[in-house]
Amino acid sequence: MKWVVSIFLIVLLNFTESRTMHENAYGIASILDSSQCSAEMNLVDLATIFFAQFVQEATYKEVNQMVKDVLTVIEKSTGSEQPAGCLENQVSVFLEEICHEEEIPEKYGLSHCCSQSGEERHNCFLARKKAAPASIPPFQVPEPVTSCKAYEENRELFMTRYIYEIARRHPFLYAPTILSLAAQYDKIIPPCCKAENAVECFQTKAASITKELRESSLLNQHMCTVMRQFGARTFRAITVTKLSQKFPKANFTEIQKLVLDVAHIHEECCRGNVLECLQDAERVVSYVCSQQDTLSSKIAECCKLPTTLELGQCIIHAENDDKPEGLSPNLNRFLGERDFNQLSSREKDLSMARFTYEYSRRHPKLAVPVILRVAKGYQELLEKCSQSENPLECQDKGEEELEKYIQESQALAKRSCGLFQKLGEYYLQNAFLVAYTKKAPQLTPPELMALTRKMATTGAACCHLSEDRQLACGEGAADLIIGQLCIRHEEMPINPGVGQCCTSSYANRRPCFSSLVLDETYVPPPFSDDKFIFHKDLCQAQGVALQTMKQQFLINLVKQKPQITEEQLEAVIADFSGLLEKCCQGQEQEVCFAEEGPALISKTRASLGV
């Protein structure tokens, strides 16, 4: 079984271009050649991934049958002269296999998609993908005795079944990434099956795979959503930023060449074209190593590794290369005497791409969204100064103001870490909980708790880093968390404020949410006593269970009075804590809550005017 890594591609975000053109808008040639195809393709695994991701509810038996059927079709189509990996219109062939099955379309609600053709059919299937379908339970690794026996009896079948289980639960996860994770799992099984404590061995060694699986799945979905929602120009800027930070010695033309090809790979991976996604991933990783002398001095040891899997992982974790000597510290008067407003659209895009490249290679520790905000601010500055009496003087003054984007992000990181140091992770989450219940009161309590728990956990992790790394850590994590919130809004609209922040500007999404205070359109529901009834289980609960109960009370309180002030909130919390202390110390806890609880709520309603 051939395993190929693609995590390297996760780092190299990109913009969408058609591969058949083999050059981007600036005439830069592609390193990918669509006339080439790989004979070394494990089509069983790739077809399994495709069908499991596009028909998530299908059983393994059903997926296995579709795999067998489509391989027969492919062999007939390509003949003996060409490898199966050369099949054209691969996605169409795979989708046709789903639709021509007698029971599959009707059983799984696919008839509407199957009634369409071409791109419409493909887009219909893509829109059906669900990140966490309720009908599919979380994956549980079988207990060691069963796993080890099944693995020993038929390793290929065991691993294909594992790939099926992962793919159907993570429909946005790139095919090469699934194969990479399966390769890691394949390696831990033999030693763990021989271990004295097999259960502990599997739990310990599978933990890192599970973590990488979860993070990669979220990241792949995030990238595909950004590509779809914000388009080519934004994705190009993201890619140029990341590549320029990773390879600061590479010239602009080389960066643009990589942008084009990594872009195509992401496009194919996001659209579920598993064969081309995998083939092109190999080529880009190989190309990076072939150009290591001009790209980076940090990947030499990586490129000596024997397998693509090891090579790719090594490059991912390699440090950003050192900045070239003689690089000027700033980009004053970057355009020189040229009038920005007189440039064509193509020239403007090229100028901004080059500015982003130059700025990124000078600031390897800044988060991508921060650099994009600087670039956006710089373009606005150029447009404004082109209309002034003294454009160059205007630029000189304005370029100093670009630091405000970095300073705003630094101030937020400092403020958040200050809160963490003062309050700890739980109370930091409560602060986020109050803020985001006001911003998005339409979210359910479990959604609000899950969202803010991620924020608090991220804050704790980032704040333990050195000060120069806190900013990139926090901004990067916030981008992903907000991205998940925006996916939720796309599926089920939350409110106009959230919608505005999610769709207006990728670079400014986080600042937009930071400045969003209240949903002015929200009307609190009529007061319900049922949401504020206290029982003795508050005294019996401990740890996470008790914290969850308290947070539920906090959410209900803020939803009832979104305009609640910090002073009012502190007073209510103090009264609530007093109630717990009084009733939990007594013998008749339930009686105490029944008597004192309503009194507390009456006092709270009077003070808040609800």
Swiss-Prot record:
Residues found modified as Phosphoserine: S111, S115, S117, S345
Gene3D superfamilies: 1.10.246.10
Signal peptide region: 1-18
Gene Ontology BP term (one): ovulation from ovarian follicle
Annotated binding of Cu(2+), by residue: H22
Subunit structure: Dimeric and trimeric forms have been found in addition to the monomeric form.
Role noted for this protein: Binds copper, nickel, and fatty acids as well as, and bilirubin less well than, serum albumin.
Official protein name in the record: Alpha-fetoprotein
Species this protein is from: Sus scrofa
